[in-house]
Amino acid sequence: MGSLVLTTALTPLSAQAGHTFTLGAWYNFAEEDDNLPTDAYTKNGEFGNEAVIFYVDGNAEPGHGIWSYSAELRIGPGSFTDVDNNATGDEISLHKAWIGLDLNDSHKVIIGKSQVPFGWKTSNFWPGDMYQAGYGDQMDVGIKLQGRQNRFGYNLAYYPRDDWWSTSTDTTDDNRHWGSSDSYRKLNTIVADLNMEIAPKHTLGIALQTGELEDLTALRSAGLKIDNQKERDGEQSAGVLYYKGKFGNNFVNAEAIQTYRSLPSDLAQQDALEQDRETRRYALEIGRNSGNWTYYLDATWAQSQTDGNREGTISAYAPGIRYDYGPGWIYAEYLTQNGYIDRYGDIVDSDYEFNALYLSIDWYYSQSK
């Protein structure tokens, strides 16, 4: 979706040890259009999607501890949260909350809700992950080991669940691609990421993930419900090959993603779905920084490899511009796409067309000690 965002840091973040509190807010104007007979799913020149954001960050002084922490709480309709399937049932989302422990200068353990180390996430603000769709800007709950040695970097992570509560599936920011509170959610996800700096400011990497899918449907057997046991007869796996590079003030990111999901059997039966679902996806981002201005284009494509899915290749493009006005950023972004990727991870309705203009502004104030 699109939004007007406002960001500012009146007090610079401390480069030394300490604690930082940041108050943020954003607001958005959206002009949307699609080829459906009604406008129930579009916004016709509407202002809104406002949110208030609270950040806390900190770390121990060198030689006086190995800890660090980071948390972000969002409140409001622009929180990028899925109200029907999150942990609060409201427009309130804990986007991230983790504690870090430095093992040494090159290795760190992160515990809590943090970024899933899988490829890269887009630079745009409101169009979002587009057809990365569940494999871009994802925040899951678990433990992650990250490290770097010379030109090599790695991440190893285990996420018992994707959100805080037993039936919430809110991965914020890119929602509605990993089930729902009455269909399924992902469990016990293992992620491995290895990347190498092939030249200064140029990184090539590969990441793999695999995990279980828990059945949350009403068809789950009575015995399992009584014993409060989980029915985990679904599974998922994915791999990504990615590149991130900078050429002076220009930047380029590219990746290819292969996804597979075997849905829980009761869910597939209930919704008359093909149980095994596969897609191949591609993403490209190019941009340039020029003073206070940043120009960028995000492009994604997806193809279904699911038996019986006759939808063609779908595509999405989001050109944008961002201006750093001091306390925050002002964004102007356009999104055009055909088709979409649903909660089950497959391509739907390649004849669907959607176009949108988003104007956004954000603002931040930080206080450090």
Model-derived features: where do they sit?
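Outer membrane beta-barrel
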Residues: 18-30, 41-164, 186, 195-200
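Cleavable N-terminal export/targeting peptides
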Residues: 1-18, 366-369
